[in-house]
Each structure stands twice: as C-alpha cells, then as structure tokens.
From Swiss-Prot:
Species assigned in the record: Glycine max
Taxon lineage: Eukaryota, Viridiplantae, Streptophyta, Embryophyta, Tracheophyta
Compartments, record wording: Vacuole, Aleurone grain; Endoplasmic reticulum; Protein storage vacuole
Record-given protein name: Glycinin G5
Top-level taxon of origin: Eukaryota
Compositionally biased residues, Basic and acidic residues: 247-260, 317-337
Length: 516
C-alpha cells in the first residue's frame, strides 16, 4: 500500500525540483535585463589578418547578455576574402561600405553555376580536356544590403571593389536553434584563424582549470586557434578526401599566418554572370580596337552601383508595399502547379531562398519627412527568410537636428549601431534616464524591450541601423498613443485643458519623424 504513495511522492519531488530549476534559469535570464544604466560600447578585441580586420564586442557585457546577442565588425581590404566558416546560430550582416560577393554551401543543394568543359591544345601535344568547375549560386552585395546567414551553413565573402568592405554583424547566440551555450563561436573550414571571442575561451579555461597536464596542453592548442580540419591528422584527411598527404597537410594549414581574411593575388575568378558579362565587354573592346583578346582578367571590374541595384530588383519578389519598378519576367508570370513542371517546394525554400535585401535606398523608405529624415524597416513581411532567423532591422537617417520621436519596442530588444553622431535618450519604467548621451560612429547601444527611446541628429545629421531580436518587431510611438486615446482621458491624466489636448493630439507631424 505504501509503494504507490512513495512513487507518487518521488515523482512530485522530481517535478518540483525541475520546476524550481527552470524558474531559477528563467529568473536569471530576466534579471539580466534589469539594467539601471546603459553604456555605449566600443569593440573589445581586434584580429588583424593579411586581408583585413575583425573587431568584436565582449559578449559578457550586461547589455549584450540582456539582448542575447553579440556583435562583430569585419573590414575586407581590396581583394580580401573572408575564409569559409559557419556558426551554430543565425546572423545578420549589414554592409555599411563597399561591395562584394558572398557564397553559401547549402547542404543537399545542387551546384547550379557550371563551367563547361573546354578543349585546350598545345604545340607538339594532343588536345587536353580541362577540368570542369561547378559551385552553388554566388550573390553580389552593395552598400546598404542586409544579408542573413543560416545557422550551420558555411559561407565566404569577397571584396570585389576598390574600397574596403565594412560589414557589421549581430550574432543571435540566444536563438532557440543554438543547442550550445550563449558563448559566441565561429567554426572555420580553412586557414589558421585567430580567436575572435577570447571571453569564450576564458570561460572554458576556468571550467578546465582543475585539469592536469594533458588538459593544459589541450588548452594551449585551443588558444592558438585553428580550423576544424586542423584537429585531424593529415593521414586521416588524405583517406577521407581521397587525396595525397601533401594536399591534406595544406588543408590543415598548421603554418598559415594569414588568419581569417586572406588577400587573393590577382583577384578572384569564379563562375558568375556578373563576372562573365564584364569579361565579354573587355574582349569586345579589344576586338574593336584591333587588339588581340587576352585571357580573361582574374580580377573583374564591376559596373556602377545602380546596375547592382537593378539586378537585385529583378531577383526580388514583389512586395505589397513596394511594387516592382519594372514588369516581371515571363517565367515569373507563369502559374505554378502544372504537373511535372512544378518545382520541388523544399528546393525553392532552401536552395533558392532570398537572403539579402537593400535597406538603405531612399526609394525603400517607409517613413519620410523631407526636413527630418527617413526610416526603412526590414522584417519577415518584406524578407520572408527572417521568420526562420528571428531577426529584423531598421535603417534610420536623421537630417540636421531631426528627431525620431519617443517610442518603445513591444516584442524585441534592439542593438543600435551609428554611422554618424547624435544624441540618444533611454528612459526606464521608473522614469530614470538609463542612457542620455552622444552616440558616435563605431559605438553600439543596446536598448532592452519596453524602455522609451528617442534619437536626435547632430549638426551633420545621424545615420544608424537598429537590429531587433524578433522577425516582426513592433514599435509603439507615444505620439500615436496620444492620438488614439480619448480627449477626456488625456485631459484627466495630464491635467490639461481641452485646447492643450487638441494641440497635443493633432498639432505637428503624425509620423515618428519630427523637424524641431
């Protein structure tokens, strides 16, 4: 008779302990955002490579722990290439300067860019057949483009322009798909990269500080960095990839000192319509002037920024609030679902998913005041892939002394990165200004969910981007709240006369942008 009671009591005790543990974890997470003071953060760590620079923010800052993100900034010099890597969480990249190319390696997707086999002949020898190259689609990006990187998918980037590419990336370490902890990690497939987030390594060292000599040697190897291939022996790699040991040793890259960003001597040559079009133009010019066409240059020159935007607009699907500026292509107008002509739905969603959108074009603005500035919003409604990432973005340009009126985030934390200089004020639930100061270029500011925030441009204006931790982040503007509340409620709430209430509700701009 006592056994069922004992079993029930034991089950109840386990359930109580589990509930207490979950409550403690949840409470700890909530307490991370009980911040009485916010700080403008600057990069804490730099990794200088052969072809560029990587700057990172310490993820242990209370503000970043509250938002569940960390941030990195990459600078790719001319002909600089960021080595293939992947992350255990999604990331969003905004290009604040320059132009380039990005390639992904989606698992299970075909190589849709192919170079046909060609016959090459040499004097005194028979014709030889060159090996064929093929790879997945390459996407081109420009200044103002927002790129989204799926978790676990390898990608690489390359600077195709003459000026450095500068890109800022929030890393959503608290994403529910990340089965590790919230410490930032980058898994490189090539090179001998340096540690980008030393705080992660420091925590691991503290956890292993009680280990013996063997663990100490292991920690020393971890501090030196390396790609995921460097942990395998060259003999094993040679067997796995069916190659010789010399090639396998280069895959391990034990002595490569170029680090994360390398310089491609002579420029990168890949299969891409954009590369090929420029090469054909160069050959046509040579024939026109009677010159013998030379071999295609390895480093392509590229068209103007407007040409890149036109290409992006052709690839974009029409948005309800932004109709296309040119007619759709015939293949886009054909109805789908006709028997065998229907393409694989999984392939369309994964292999050909749209992963970038320009957010900085003036024609892209959702709010505009010719005397105050403009606002552009990017969320899962305008870029459906963001629904899987749980991120969104907002691009704001404030003209001289222009004001972004007070608002708050209903369902997201936000990370603000500036390109100019302006004043920001954040007020918490107690009516205290947890931040009231100037935000300069290169700094970031984390604003938790619900505190009211307002921005004002300086004498030279203010340009900034806001990353938000929800795929469809919603903001509520205090001016809009005044408009929808009955006059009597406002009169009694603020002790105002009717004329003052009418002035408060209906005088001035109806949108969030204000010119003082």
């Amino acid at each position: 008779m006592g056994k069922p009671f004992f079993t029930l009591s034991l089950s109840s005790l386990c359930l109580l302990l589990l509930s207490s543990a979950c409550f403690a974890i949840t409470s700890s997470k909530f307490n991370e955002c009980q911040l009485n003071n916010l700080n403008a953060l600057e990069p804490d760590h730099r990794v200088e490579s052969e072809g560029g620079l990587i700057e990172t923010w310490n993820s242990q800052h209370p503000e970043l722990q509250c938002a569940g993100v960390t941030v990195s900034k990459r600078t790719l010099n001319r002909n600089g290439s960021h080595l293939p890597s992947y992350l255990p969480y999604p990331q969003m990249i905004i290009v604040v300067q320059g132009k380039g190319a990005i390639g992904f390696a989606f698992p299970g997707c075909p190589e849709t860019f192919e170079k046909p086999q060609q016959q090459s002949s040499r004097r005194g020898s028979r014709s030889q057949q060159q090996l064929q190259d093929s790879h997945q689609k390459i996407r081109h990006f420009n200044e103002g483009d927002v790129l989204v990187i799926p978790l676990g998918v390898p990608y690489w980037t390359y600077n195709t322009g003459d000026e450095p590419v500068v890109a800022i990336s929030p890393l959503d370490t608290s994403n529910f798909n990340n089965q590790l902890d919230q410490n930032p990690r980058v898994f490189y497939l090539a090179g001998n990269p340096d540690i980008e987030h030393p705080e992660t390594m420091q925590q691991q060292q503290q956890q292993k500080s009680h280990g013996g000599r063997k663990q100490g040697q292991h920690r020393q190897q971890e501090e030196e960095g390396g790609s995921v291939l460097s942990g395998f022996s060259k003999h094993f790699l040679a067997q796995s990839f069916n190659t010789n040991e010399d090639t396998a040793e280069k895959l391990r890259s034990p002595d490569d000192e170029r680090k994360q960003i390398v310089t491609v001597e002579g420029g990168l040559s890949v299969i891409s319509p954009k590369w090929q079009e420029q090469e054909d133009e160069d050959e046509d010019e040579d024939e026109e002037y009677g010159r013998t066409p030379s071999y295609p240059p390895r480093r392509p020159s590229h068209g103007k920024h407007e040409d890149d935007e036109d290409e992006d607009e052709e690839e974009d699907q029409p948005r309800p609030d932004h109709p296309p500026q040119r007619p759709s292509r015939p293949e886009q107008q054909e109805p789908r679902g006709r028997g065998c002509q229907t393409r694989n739905g999984v392939e369309e969603n994964i292999c050909t998913m749209k992963l970038h959108e320009n957010i900085a074009r003036p024609s892209r603005a959702d709010f505009y005041n010719p005397k105050a500035g403009r606002i552009s919003t990017l969320n899962s409604l305008t870029l459906p892939a963001l629904r899987q990432f749980g991120l969104s973005a907002q691009y704001v340009v404030l003209y001289r002394n222009g004001i972004y009126s007070p608002d708050w985030n209903l369902n997201a934390n936000s990370v603000t990165m500036t390109r100019g200089k302006g004043r920001v004020r954040v007020v918490n639930c107690q009516g205290n200004a947890v931040f009231d100061g100037e935000l300069r270029r290169g700094q970031l500011l984390v604003v938790p969910q619900n505190p009211a925030v307002a921005e004002q441009g300086g004498e030279q204006g203010l340009e900034y981007v806001v990353f938000k931790t929800h795929h469809n982040a919603v903001s509520s503007y205090i001016k809009d709240v005044f408009r929808v509340i009955p006059s009597e409620v406002l009169s009694n709430s603020y002790n105002l006369g009717q004329s003052q209430v009418r002035q408060l509700k209906y005088q001035g701009n109806s949108g969030p942008l204000v010119n003082p």
